[in-house]
Regions:
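Signature of Gram-negative outer-membrane beta-barrel scaffolds
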Residues: 1-78
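Transmembrane beta-strands of outer-membrane beta-barrel pores
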Residues: 1-2, 87-93, 100, 131, ...
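Short sequence motifs at beta-strands and strand-loop junctions characteristic
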Residues: 59-67, 116-119, 168-174, 219-226, ...
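Outer-membrane beta-barrel strand-turn architecture
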Residues: 67, 75-79, 119, 129-133, ...
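Hydrophobic, lipid-facing positions within transmembrane beta-strands of outer-membrane proteins
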Residues: 67-71, 111, 121-125, 174-178, ...
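Membrane-embedded beta-barrel scaffold of Gram-negative outer-membrane proteins
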Residues: 76-99, 114-176, 180-183, 197, ...
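Gram-negative outer-membrane beta-barrel transporters
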Residues: 135-146, 164-259, 322-326
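C-terminal beta-signal and adjacent terminal beta-strands/loops
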Residues: 207, 249-260, 278-327
Length: 327
């Protein structure tokens, strides 16, 4: 995999050039010559004046190559139970840094011109089971993921006055996920389903000398618990119609929006309730729904894009009717 700035916003930063305008003279409006910094000729035009010295052997591409593996073994102790174990790898390719070559005030760290891939090793054990004479299906997995060289964007003025990225930390993730669907044999028309996720995430080692990333912090968008539950009950009406009612619930524990402290914000926990009820025939159907029954101001996401705090909320209490007709 090869990535570079050619034809991108970084490759033609304020110069209106790039692959879309090949005849354009490479002249930057504000003196920011990103294209010259990464053109592979071992010199830095205008940047040489700014820094006082040329930097040699600057890469013009970030290249990654290798092999990732996935291995799965399964075992059936009975016709109703499947057990499996999976070992898998993953990665994200590296990239180039705009402020490559900048050095921290104490000289202990230099922003890399290109940073490396981050790598993930995942260990998983899972099961799929039909229980209670086939009336219940219960699936789940327990897993651990180890991340080496986690790519992170950092803003630390003691190093550079621009955001830069590096393999800034190692991290671990452990968790359990499960889902269930159950149709009790002694209650005709009732179906109960739900899901549960438990997570424990942690930065285990900081690789860049900055306070932006801290050992022991959790990863971004990783709530310790998420759950959902719904129960649908159906019954027959005169004339062959079917009626149904289904209350449902979803919950998320608190989480954080980023791993770097300057952008890290708490996303509060929330619980949302809802209900649907309706009638269905062979030709038509009508359903009343109420989502977010308690009008919970649920925070789904937070970010600091363009240095402004932004919060994405769930829709407020919403009521409506769905109508269907089969031709």
């Amino acid at each position: 995999i090869t990535v570079d700035f050619d034809g991108s916003a970084n490759g033609s930063f304020y110069n209106f050039c790039g692959s879309a305008n090949p005849d354009c003279v490479d002249a930057q409006v504000f003196g920011t010559n990103i294209a010259d910094l990464y053109n592979g000729d071992s010199t830095i035009g205008g940047e040489t004046v700014y820094r006082g010295t040329a930097v040699e052997d600057i890469p013009d591409k970030a290249e990654s190559s290798g092999t990732i593996l996935k291995f799965t073994a399964s075992y059936r102790p009975s016709d109703d139970v499947l057990l499996y174990a999976t070992l898998s790898e993953g990665f994200r390719p590296g990239f180039l840094n705009r402020p490559g070559g900048y050095t921290s005030s104490d000289g202990s760290y230099t922003v890399p011109f290109n940073f490396e891939t981050d790598e993930l090793m995942n260990y998983e054990f899972g099961w799929k089971a039909d229980l209670l004479d086939g009336s219940m299906r219960f699936n789940g997995s327990a897993f651990m993921s180890v991340i080496d060289g986690l790519q992170t964007t950092i803003f630390d003025p003691s190093i550079a006055n621009l955001f830069f990225s590096d393999n800034s930390a190692d991290a671990e993730i452990t968790g359990v996920e499960m889902d269930l669907i159950w149709a009790p044999a002694n209650i005709d028309g009732l179906t109960i389903s739900g899901g549960l996720s438990l997570l424990d995430t942690e930065i285990t080692k900081v690789l860049v000398p900055t306070d932006d990333v801290r050992k022991g912090d959790s990863l971004a968008f990783a709530p310790e618990m998420q759950a959902n539950l719904q129960a649908r009950y159906e019954w027959s009406l005169e004339g062959g119609a079917m009626a149904h009612v289904m209350p449902h619930m979803s919950h998320s524990a608190e989480q954080y929006s980023d791993i770097i402290r300057i952008n890290r914000d708490l996303i509060h926990s929330w619980t949302m309730l809802g209900i649907t009820a309706g009638i269905t025939t062979d030709t038509w159907g009508a359903e009343l729904f109420i989502d977010n029954l308690t009008d919970e101001r649920a925070e789904l996401s937070r970010n600091y894009i363009n240095d402004r705090e932004r919060v994405s909320y769930a829709r407020p209490r919403t009521m409506g009717v769905r109508l269907t007709y089969n031709f």
